[in-house]
């Protein structure tokens, strides 16, 4: 059964909001669910379109896949000492989530097997929209450079969430698996924590970000 990308992202976001954050941005929390008000857009009447919305409008479906179940693509993140798997039934099936303690800092990895044709460049032009619509979002860094040879978009920033200032990192990669199938995947990797603990948590966060892997087997 194909899961609509928007709904899967919403579920993950809701989990982050209710109890899961870091020094590098997690735009799962930014997508703090269904309809976060576009507080940082220049025209509130026309908020930016998310990548999930773009893909849905293009007729593209997405089926969640556990990263460790992939056979035509290697997708993984490391687990620093003191971090452990974070389980929540609201997360999309197959989501890999690790946290230090009961909530933040947290890292989340989701993979969607895509069904349908679309313009990758156009899709990635919408990759940062959800982050930019978070409350009082302040951009710190962005990149549209490929990641390990795959089309990608990255954004870092800080934003307000439930009375706390968060610092988050989000990267979306659109990768094509090994032949002969050459399946296309959307990979979303996010890391989030409290902004006031950014320096303290930086070593672990940097380890996770640097260890994020997307490659052909």
What spans do the regions from the language model cover?
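Short acidic-hydrophobic surface loop/beta-edge motif
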Residues: 61-71, 96-100, 143-146, 157-159
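Signature of long, low-cysteine stretches enriched in small and polar/charged residues
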Residues: 128-180
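N-terminal targeting sequences that direct proteins away from the cytosol to non-cytosolic compartments
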Residues: 2-94, 181, 192-217
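Short hydrophobic/glycine-rich mini-motifs in sensory/regulatory modules
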Residues: 180-187
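Extracytoplasmic/secreted proteins, especially bacterial periplasmic and envelope-associated proteins
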Residues: 122, 126, 204-207
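A short acidic-to-branched-hydrophobic micro-motif
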Residues: 96-122, 169
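Extracytoplasmic
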Residues: 70-74, 102-106, 150-152
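Solvent-exposed loop/turn segments at secondary-structure junctions
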Residues: 114-116, 159-162, 193-197
